[in-house]
């Protein structure tokens, strides 16, 4: 193996834990782990540790959980570890300039897109939402901007017509550790080749909201089908029927022109619930009424056919 780097790892969710696990499995020297404070979760609102904390404690690594890295005493926690590099994966806290400059080789980040496309909070979802043909991971040198640092390594993968944000998340959670380990080797060997991002190609991946996930029937069927996959498993595309939210898990596009107003139910049968859109027909295949499990359109029609009378409009 190349020169053994002293690594600080900073991350919080399962996506980050897969990267830390890969580093440890490949023999890297992780000298400390930073993760967000325990948060209330579940019905009992019991304080729960992050997946990163669970893994780090399992492996006997020192864990630090500052609320912020702005206070001097918290920055000193980083300095005292005398790291060569800090690896940041979905940490959730801003790293001040002073922290970015502490490790000898700086701080590097694993980002879930092919930068400079989809800088920001929701790159996986936005790549699906926009109909991109491929996505991937970028390992970049961090600076004070939002995903603006020089790119060190990229790995790409195709986006299929069946991918959801959930399946794409899993694909990138496999690619990310591969790219990270390669990048660390290059940093240790002095062979890394930073590449400046082309500002003319930048797009921003804004955070998702539950309101954005409400189905807008004026959009095209193709756009709506992509939204349904992009917002799965969160926040989930939804429509409202009789004041109740109904989540949509799966749909398909029927490329047939219709003069019906967007939102008009055209057919409701065992093939699905066909609804007119701004362009084309969206066929709803799997839905989930409030308080119920997801079910096929046919199963929902068996219990709630009055919701989907042809000619009625969904709003």
Curated annotation (Swiss-Prot):
Identify the EC number(s): 2.1.2.9
> Can the keyword Transferase be found in this entry's annotation?
yes
Any single Gene Ontology cellular-component annotation: cytosol
Molecular-function GO terms, alphabetical: methionyl-tRNA formyltransferase activity
> What UniProt keywords are attached to this protein's entry?
Protein biosynthesis, Transferase
Q: Which residues bind (6S)-5,6,7,8-tetrahydrofolate?
A: 113-116
* Enzyme class at the top of the EC tree: transferase
| Reactions mediated catalytically | L-methionyl-tRNA(fMet) + (6R)-10-formyltetrahydrofolate = N-formyl-L-methionyl-tRNA(fMet) + (6S)-5,6,7,8-tetrahydrofolate + H(+)
The family database entries (CDD domains) matched by this protein are listed as: FMT_core_Met-tRNA-FMT_N, Met_tRNA_FMT_C
Homology family: Belongs to the Fmt family.
Q: What does this protein do?
A: Attaches a formyl group to the free amino group of methionyl-tRNA(fMet). The formyl group appears to play a dual role in the initiator identity of N-formylmethionyl-tRNA by promoting its recognition by IF2 and preventing the misappropriation of this tRNA by the elongation apparatus.
Q: Which NCBIfam families match?
A: fmt
Protein name, entry field? Methionyl-tRNA formyltransferase
